[in-house]
Amino acid sequence: MKPASRLFYLSLFALWSPEAQCKSDESCAISPKAIVSDACASYSTLEQLNRDIKPALEDLTRTTDFFSHYRLNLFNKECPFWNDENGMCGNIACAVETLDNEEDIPEVWRAKELGKLEGPRAKHPGKSVQKEEPKRPLQGKLGEDVGESCVVEYDDECDDRDYCVPDDEGASSKGDYVSLLRNPERFTGYAGDGAKQVWDAIYRENCFQKSSFPKSASLGDTYSVPKNPAAQDFRAVMQAAGRQHMLEQQREQNPLVPFVTKTGLESEDECLEKRVFYKIVSGMHASISTHLCWDFLNQTTGQWQPNLSCYINRLHKFPERISNLYFNYALLTRAVAKLGPYLSSHEEYTFCTGDPAQDADTRAKVLAVTSKAANTVPGPVFDESIMFKNGEGPSLKEDFRNRFRNISRLMDCVGCDKCRLWGKLQTAGYGTALKVLFEFANNDTSATSSETDEIPFKLKRTELVALFNTYARLSSSLDAIQKFRAMVEESEEGQQPQSHEQIEGSENSGAHHIPDRAKKPRHVIVPTPDAADHAEASDTNTATTAVDEAKAAGVTPAPKVEHQQQVEVDNNDDDDDDDEFHEFQRQPQQPDTDPNFVYKKRTLKDDFENEFRAVFAAFKLVIRSYLNLPALIYEITITELKRFWQFYVGLPVMPRTWEFRRPSLDEL
């Protein structure tokens, strides 16, 4: 009974604990010193690491022919999951061309043009051409200044340990070589049902199901008592409370956010391997969204510029997405660092077979990146050695690999050429990182020499290009996220002084808080005409002096009131409860349009009619409330039944739409 009682008290204390006071939800979720979930480094550590690596990484991917060109089968594959004609409503012929303002946009800025690939393309040469022209197998189709021996891929063999589907597998065409510099990842206008269908398939059709081997976690392992069970129970309780709180906040902003019980991916109580899978997908999505928001085309002016509202709506309001982006950066940093020793020597890997000078230059730039990734931060930023270690490890790894291959296949369903290019490249990059982390031997004494020797030849050129370019994309995402965050802070700080000055201005002008009772409608009893004439005669000199002073100061005086009357002061309060009482308030006499109007003395008949109208209006109000009572009780009953059902099945309970409260003094 000890664990049960301990868990009960831990749960009780966790639920009673007050929420942390933060400036915003984002500052609580992403603190610089906080450790990224399931990684081994803090947010500030990864940001500092990115500042050190980013210059060398950009130099590698932008100035070398090997890493600036990519080979893929972009046009000769069909979507294997649904019919393109029915499923690609986000394509140029459906969701893009039918936009109302598409015709008003210059043709060069339209989504159809933005999605096209730019620059020269070259077909993959056959083996005979490769033998006849080893130095120029592409025959100059990519340009005379491109080192073709650094671009052409000579190994077309596939590996069953791949985490993505090679583009050349089972295809009639060997693919095209395209320039990544001429086709940057940025806004293309690709949106609509087609894009949503692809992401829905990635998130929902590739989610893990419940374990097929619920008791297999202990297979092959000796039984041992878990260490610190109280700490583990407390950690589980705190994580569950935090997830539930975050889920409720998300569903308040967007009711379409899926529940954790439906997806099975977001849940932290799943095993580490399943959490890593979901974080990779979510982080990739966040990275793509960051690039689209940072390099956004203003289709009115034709300028490429950051879109702050795009960032706020897609990322800033969802700190877990940004956290997953940081996790992906840590994962790829570990893969690049682990790959460094295998690319260090010329005997292990050759980048440019026909150009030793370019080969040496490319190797030096690659090693500059891998050395910074391995040595900038003490210790690994991600520990892959703890994954796939229990009894279910082999089957779970195979399931992990197959589901990531499904994501690779889904990229053929994207209807935009540039989007499909970068989608294929980044899924291949993440697949290569997973292959390096989970299939390659670690650099320890347990790794045999045979394992170490065979590893480099399992990586094809496309895998290396995809890995380092995906790493560069994540690096740019982290840099853009920090700049966007600074822009948000500047915009918030820019609004704060204005409101502060307004508050100070109201205080200096003598404005005070007006109680609610003083805001209610009042009757102002105006003196009789004789008294008014007497007051006017006695104050003539004072009024004349005030008018002269006002004119001298440049202020237009208010017009003189000829006939004062009994009026009702109403501040147009927004209280709806007061509005329904206005109909039976005593109405004062209204003057005629005659300028010589004289107030008549109220008679007994006038008082009786006025009181009768007020009593009749109050009677109608009471009867109406009784008639509405059954419908009100029915609505309250339905609401409470819904709340009970949500509580019973474990869903977030919606707030009440009604309440019991005592009437205030003003209402009485």
UniProtKB/Swiss-Prot annotation:
May function both as a monomer and a homodimer. One of its GO terms (cellular component) is endoplasmic reticulum membrane. It comes from Neurospora crassa (strain ATCC 24698 / 74-OR23-1A / CBS 708.71 / DSM 1257 / FGSC 987). Its EC number is 1.8.4.-. Belongs to the EROs family. Essential oxidoreductase that oxidizes proteins in the endoplasmic reticulum to produce disulfide bonds. Acts by oxidizing directly pdi1 isomerase through a direct disulfide exchange. Does not act as a direct oxidant of folding substrate, but relies on pdi1 to transfer oxidizing equivalent. Does not oxidize all pdi related proteins, suggesting that it can discriminate between pdi1 and related proteins. Its reoxidation probably involves electron transfer to molecular oxygen via FAD. Acts independently of glutathione. The active site is at C416, C419. Pfam families: ERO1. Residues 116-142, 488-519, 554-597 are annotated as: Disordered. The keyword Protein transport does not apply. It comes from the Eukaryota. The keyword Nuclease does not apply. FAD binds at R186, T188, W199, S282, H285, R314. This is Endoplasmic reticulum oxidoreductin-1. Glycans are attached at N298, N307, N406, N443. Residues 1-22 form the signal peptide. It is a peripheral membrane protein. Keywords: Disulfide bond, Electron transport, Endoplasmic reticulum, FAD, Flavoprotein, Glycoprotein, Membrane, Oxidoreductase, Redox-active center, Signal, Transport. Residues 570-581 have a biased composition (Acidic residues).
